[in-house]
Amino acid sequence: MNRGDYKNQKHPMVWGYRNVWFDFEPSIANLMIPCSLNDLDLMHETFMSCFTTQKKASFPSPTYDGPFSAWARQIQKDQRKLLATLLGEEFFIRHDNPNVRNSSGFIFIHAMLADGFLDEVEELKSHVQNN
């Protein structure tokens, strides 16, 4: 992606998400998507059906050996537990949105404008090249 690639779009966004390779704290996430237990199971089943070569991925994490989807499901469950610790379980029990009330996991997203993303990429690239 280069700055000129999106000149005809008003405000393109780039989404980064917490996954098996990249970890970030809830304070970095500016979008949190609740997932039901059914959502988490469906994601895992879909992955196992569609990405057959990744069923036995050899290195999804230094602390886990198994399918990416099982590790991702656990991460999303852990993120829900972390939010419950930070906000209290009552936050979820009394929440107006049934998706939040019934959540078993959360996907953490860090959304930013494309220019901001490219600023960060350029800063990181400069840092890496100078070290």
Where are these regions (language model features)?
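Metal-dependent de-N-acetylase/amidase catalytic core
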Residues: M1-N131
